[in-house]
Amino acid sequence: MIRVGIVGFGTIGKRIADAVAAQGDMHVSGVLKVTPDYEVLVAAAKGFKVYTLPDRVEKFKKAGIEPAGTIEDLIKASDVIIDASPEDVGAENKEKYYSKFDKPVIFQGGEEAEVAEVSFNALANYDEARGRRYVRVVSCNTTGITRVLTSLMLNGVGIKKARIFIARRGADPKEYKKGPINDVVPNPATVPSHHGPDVKTVLKNVDIVTMAVAVPVTIMHMHMAFLELDGAYPRDAVLEALAKTPRIFLADVGAGFQSLAQIIEYARDLGRPRGDFPEVAIFRDSVTVNGNELYLMYGVHQESIVVPENVDAVRAVLGAMPKWESIKKTDTTLKLFTEGKRYG
């Protein structure tokens, strides 16, 4: 049983904790919180031991919460650490704590690529993470782009260049201090946005440029993609490649999927925890082939898309399971769509 310690229990961390707990070969050794708030109560109710930073122990005790120990205790009690801290905090934790221990650590996409030896996406480069000490699961948008490109390349559809235009959600649902509320903000105004270079940390040879704006929604990101392929492929061949790749979902307008909100409503109706949708949701009707040009639109659920990637990263760094076996196990335990998918 792999003991997984999770540093951070926010939007991503709490989802990773639940996902790890659902795996038959993993156990949540504990979670780390820096604030003694309601999320501590949630973690405790789920049976997770709660740790904190050394300088926060007394604050927890004053709030009537006895922590299981400090971050160093959590590291000692774990075979691998997943750091789901806010942006840049993971790098600080690496310097202060992780560097003292010979334990693998998995960071999130909010950290700079230099924090790790490998930037990770399960479909694209699972085996590159084997035996590594520091691995970084790329961000939600980068994960979405990488999955789409890899789904084509795994099925023999070559990509000469990719141009992706991103409408980013302004904030996560619980982030009441963020926006915009009534605006569209270049994010950034310069070209490329950071997503393209980030994709290249995984897919080294891809020719990609990205642009992004932030919009006043909280549900999902929307990507509009133009891909130049290495030849003229039938639309059916492209759709087949997408349909049989794990963690890709084809949404049909004729079935009622006319917006991203309906994708999330579908997840809720399915009874998925928190209404999460870890798959990339590609609008089938948008998939258009014109010679060697491919156009498509797809949604990325920023709160959950990286969760299965973190689970697979645990097995990858420890060499615990082959790539496709891990991906299939993760998808099955998290109840993602597996029918018609090819694992291998």
Swiss-Prot record:
Subcellular location: Cytoplasm
Positions annotated to bind NAD(+): T11, I12, G110, R169, Q302
Gene Ontology molecular function, alphabetical: 4-hydroxy-tetrahydrodipicolinate reductase; glyceraldehyde-3-phosphate dehydrogenase (NAD+) (phosphorylating) activity; glyceraldehyde-3-phosphate dehydrogenase (NADP+) (phosphorylating) activity; NAD binding; NADP binding
Pfam family for this entry, one: DapB_N
SUPFAM superfamilies: Glyceraldehyde-3-phosphate dehydrogenase-like, C-terminal domain, NAD(P)-binding Rossmann-fold domains
Oxidoreductase in keyword set: yes
This enzyme's EC code(s): 1.2.1.59
Enzyme class, UniProt record, top EC level: oxidoreductase
A single GO BP: glycolytic process
Domain of life according to the entry: Archaea
HAMAP family: G3P_dehdrog_arch (MF_00559)
Quaternary state and interactors: Homotetramer.
Protein known as: Glyceraldehyde-3-phosphate dehydrogenase
